[in-house]
């Protein structure tokens, strides 16, 4: 009996083995990487599929296919016996690879050859493009039109509300790190070798990681969105950089984008979306490639390329569910290398959607890849961002207080990492993140620790931080936050002006390391020409604790300032300090030399909310003393009666005034929704901040009292109201317009020192919001409207000019204008202006009454003052040169008369022995009507 059972068991085992052998047929597999055969760059999103033979259609694509990932890696296998493998991508020749049945190959490097009849030919030969591609009757165009028409139909945004959890990780790595480690210099960095990742095409070293966990809230009616970051962590080289604008610039580069919008905001530019409802089918050419399976869904692979590859668009693939919904399951997009885009050699996005239980489609995962370079596009920094969505909830009501703040994003003030702020253990992060870190990513802290033990590396970090923050730390450490007091701004140590000559300045500012709520900054300065010492001392108390400076995070503080220094009325100091060395480089035109010595005692309160609404209240006492060519002379008109004719007239008399005191209160309301700007140590918006898209609305009112009673005057009570609007307007891939409008009014009678004088620029550098050919204090007004507009073509015009497009220049045009007037009450040349200060005049005139030299100031006339400029940017990637021309007020009357002179320089007299008076005029010479200005701007 036992032998029978054993026999039966053997039969069953043999039969099972036969069945298993039949159920596990021979598997053919291959994995590797796809690269550009010319450059060696990896190729993401290449279509890869097995071919199969049919009886009636011959060799066709099989149902088994995949795409290379964002790094060009791929893996594919089949058990159906397919051995021919096809590699296909727009712009490259199709590659065919043959395997043996059952073969399993790994580490294969597939080189694809650029197709001269592919993407490049679409741009170069429009005749062929027109012949080969037609929109009318094209199934691909009809397909994309259906997708665009239904793109919002099954989107999660059609739900009444939702909540989702997000995990975001960004890594930075040094790419193509091929060096000779035996050389003397590189031997110092021999420890880096163990951190080199060789799994990619080129060896790379991960140097920085940032990750955060957050929640996203959405409500359809009324429309409200909110992102709340609950935890964040940064470690690596980035944690050593002291410029807050660096982190914000990175956030702006890798911001969330929506393909359903008409344009996509990437790399501080606007790219036309392949699903644009307005110009998609005219901007792109679409091709149906194949039908493949994507995560179990049969999808149509729709490839697309821009009509002009130098326009701001994408190449890529749309994977559209092959049913009546025309729903987008996945997309993979790349930026064409022909685009006039700097510092980026590769940029790709792969985005997946998933279907929720209620049938709506929601984001599932986004992977963004970028390679940045400075000098050599073969070496640079690799950046990768991965965002994963989980926990979609469309049912649970959202608490009302979630949307209590108007801002679309809440970020904790304190960083949640082991460096500063709340400590969260590495083990806790391991449990929180949905995907583990690789060994190379997890070892970043160890790498940085070894770097910071090197004096050479610490010196390099100190130099970079000094340039970007303009301050030198006083701690011998690579960590900027270790310093208690920093010295700077470094670009203000030495400067020059007409009054002081060479100006020497030394100062600094404290940090949160000294005290996290009390801050001090100040300086002392000395002029080699006027020999007067100047100073500034500012004490600030912040109501919230800060990590480094009082201008990180939301601003809420009160300040006390004592200052004695030189001021130049009408000088543009919006972006840089007046004594910045670059602002003191003069142009060839003569400067006016109008200066004041001013003592300030000032207190200020500032409060900023998450929604970027802020209020500022300031009280300032000042004592003003004229200097240089500037003088204060009170004009008093007295009535004169002719004893013969009994005619009356008003004759002016001038009373010199040495100084006056001023008491002024200021209230400012500012709203800039979506503004990510960071502020430097002086409280100015950082010049390194590249994202300028947010609008700004600012309403300011001044009320004050000018006290000159000690000079025999009556004093002046005044009110001034001013409104400013600033916004960047994008025109998709066709550039953008930067617009600033400012208007204001002075309500009471005030001397010229309190009138509005347009902001002027006397340096060789272009002032975006100032007048570049107007002289300092040339015009004065009490009612005014100013316009500053600059249009950046972003290369779309020059790209269409053969030959010139090879230079990769970008055109820029602009206009600056001011229109206003001076009412009678504030015109010292009229008797109604009695008691005012005379406009400063130190000019000399020729025999015909024309201005020759010196200084003069006058009310503006009936015409607006207009300047235009045109030029090119992207010269060596960061230089911009503009030709500037003065359009109006090139020959105009001054509001007074001057004696007519003979050839000997003596006044000419009439029959009564009185000087002959002629109308004074000012004619701007040719060199003063035209100018060339330079500016430095990263043309991204």
Regions found by a protein language model. Give the residues of each.
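Exposed, low-structure sequence patches enriched in small/polar residues
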Residues: 406-940
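A short, amphipathic beta-strand motif
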Residues: 28-36, 72, 110
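Structured extracytoplasmic
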Residues: 117, 121, 128-299, 305-313, ...
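Conserved "repeat-terminator" motif of extracellular CCP/Sushi domains
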Residues: 22-25, 108-126
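Short, ordered, surface-exposed loop/turn motifs in non-cytosolic proteins
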Residues: 28-30, 38-56, 80
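A short, solvent-exposed loop/turn motif at the edges and junctions
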Residues: 55-57, 61, 84-98
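Short, acidic Ser/Thr/Gly-rich low-complexity loop/linker segments typical of extracellular
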Residues: 54-73
């Amino acid at each position: 009996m036992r032998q029978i059972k054993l026999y039966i068991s053997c039969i069953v085992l043999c039969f099972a083995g036969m069945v298993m052998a039949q159920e596990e047929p021979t598997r053919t597999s291959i994995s590797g990487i796809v690269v550009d055969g010319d450059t060696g760059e990896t190729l993401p999103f290449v279509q890869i599929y097995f071919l199969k033979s049919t009886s009636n259609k011959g060799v066709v694509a099989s149902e088994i296919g995949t795409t290379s990932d964002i790094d060009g890696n791929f893996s594919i296998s089949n058990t159906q016996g397919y051995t021919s493998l096809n590699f296909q991508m727009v712009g490259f020749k199709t590659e065919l690879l043959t395997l043996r049945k059952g073969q399993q190959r790994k580490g294969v490097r597939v080189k694809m050859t650029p197709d001269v009849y592919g993407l490049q030919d679409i741009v170069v030969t429009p005749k062929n493009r027109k012949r080969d591609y037609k929109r009318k009757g094209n199934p691909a165009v009809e397909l994309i039109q259906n997708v665009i028409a239904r793109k919002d139909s099954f989107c999660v945004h059609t739900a009444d509300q939702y909540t989702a959890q997000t995990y975001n990780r960004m890594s930075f790595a040094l790419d193509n790190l091929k060096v000779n480690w035996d050389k003397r210099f590189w031997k110092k960095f021999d420890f880096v070798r163990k951190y080199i990742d060789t799994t990619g095409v080129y060896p790379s070293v991960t140097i920085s990681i940032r990750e955060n966990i957050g929640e996203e809230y959405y409500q359809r009616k009324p429309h409200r969105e909110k992102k709340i970051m609950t935890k964040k962590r940064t470690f690596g080289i980035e944690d050593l950089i002291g410029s807050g604008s660096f982190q914000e610039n990175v956030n702006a580069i890798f911001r969330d984008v929506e393909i359903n919008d008409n344009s996509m905001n990437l790399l501080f530019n606007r790219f036309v979306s392949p699903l644009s409802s307005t110009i998609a089918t005219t901007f792109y050419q679409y091709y149906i490639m194949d039908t493949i399976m994507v995560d179990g869904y049969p999808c149509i692979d729709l490839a697309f390329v821009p009509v002009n590859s130098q326009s701001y668009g994408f190449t890529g693939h749309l994977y559209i569910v092959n049913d009546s919904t025309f729903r987008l399951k996945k997309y993979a997009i790349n930026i064409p290398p022909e685009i006039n885009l700097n510092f980026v050699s590769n940029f790709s996005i792969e985005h997946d959607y998933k279907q929720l239980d209620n049938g709506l489609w929601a984001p599932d995962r986004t992977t963004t890849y970028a390679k940045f370079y400075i000098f050599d596009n073969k070496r640079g920094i690799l950046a990768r961002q991965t965002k994963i969505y989980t926990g979609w909830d469309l049912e649970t009501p959202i608490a009302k207080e979630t949307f209590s703040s108007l801002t679309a994003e809440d970020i904790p003030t304190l960083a949640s990492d082991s460096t500063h702020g709340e400590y969260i253990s590495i083990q806790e992060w391991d449990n929180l993140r949905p995907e583990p870190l690789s060994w190379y990513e997890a070892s970043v802290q160890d790498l940085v620790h070894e770097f910071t033990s090197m004096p050479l590396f610490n010196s390099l970090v100190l130099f970079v931080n000094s340039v970007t923050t303009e301050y030198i730390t006083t701690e011998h450490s690579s960590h900027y936050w270790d310093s208690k007091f920093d010295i700077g701004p470094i670009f203000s140590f030495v400067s020059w002006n007409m009054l002081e000559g060479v100006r020497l300045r030394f100062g600094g500012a404290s940090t949160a390391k000294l005290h996290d709520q009390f801050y001090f900054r100040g300086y002392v300065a000395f002029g080699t020409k006027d020999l007067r010492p100047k100073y500034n001392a500012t004490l600030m108390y912040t109501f919230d604790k800060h990590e480094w400076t009082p201008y990180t995070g939301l601003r809420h503080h009160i300040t006390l300032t004592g200052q004695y220094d030189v001021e130049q009325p009408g000088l543009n100091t919006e972006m840089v300090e007046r004594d910045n060395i670059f602002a003191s480089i003069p142009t060839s035109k003569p400067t006016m030399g109008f200066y004041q010595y001013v003592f300030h005692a000032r207190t200020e309160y500032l409060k900023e909310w998450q929604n970027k609404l802020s209020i500022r209240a300031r009280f300032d006492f000042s004592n003003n003393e004229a200097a240089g060519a500037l003088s204060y002379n009170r004009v008093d008109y007295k009535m004169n009666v002719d004893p013969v004719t009994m005619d009356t007239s008003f004759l002016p008399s001038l009373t010199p005034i040495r100084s006056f005191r001023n008491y002024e209160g200021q209230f400012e309301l500012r709203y800039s929704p979506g503004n990510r700007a960071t502020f430097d140590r002086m409280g100015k918006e950082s010049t390194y901040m590249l994202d300028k898209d947010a609008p700004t609305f600012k309403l300011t009112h001044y009320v004050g009292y000018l006290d000159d009673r000690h000079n025999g005057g009556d004093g002046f009570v005044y009110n001034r109201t001013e409104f400013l609007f600033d916004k960047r307007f994008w025109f998709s891939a066709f550039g953008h317009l930067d617009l600033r409008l400012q208007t204001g009014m002075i309500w009471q009678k005030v001397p010229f020192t309190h009138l509005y004088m347009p902001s002027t620029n006397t340096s060789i550098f272009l002032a975006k919001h100032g007048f570049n050919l107007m002289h300092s204090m040339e015009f004065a007004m009490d009612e005014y409207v100013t316009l500053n507009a600059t249009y950046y073509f972003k290369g779309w015009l020059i790209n269409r000019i053969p030959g010139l497009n090879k230079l990769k220049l970008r055109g820029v045009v602009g206009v600056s204008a001011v229109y206003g007037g001076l009412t009678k009450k504030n015109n010292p040349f009229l008797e109604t202006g009695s008691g005012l200060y005379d406009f400063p005049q130190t000019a000399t005139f020729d025999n015909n009454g024309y201005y020759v030299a010196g200084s003069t100031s006058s009310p503006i006339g009936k015409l607006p003052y207009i300047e235009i400029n045109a030029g090119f940017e992207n010269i060596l990637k960061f230089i911009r040169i503009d030709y500037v021309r003065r359009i109006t007020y090139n020959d105009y009357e001054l509001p007074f008369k001057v004696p007519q002179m003979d050839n000997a320089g003596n006044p000419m007299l009439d029959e009564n022995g009185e000087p002959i008076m002629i109308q004074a005029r000012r004619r701007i010479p040719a060199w003063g009507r035209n100018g060339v200005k330079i500016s430095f701007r990263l043309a991204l």
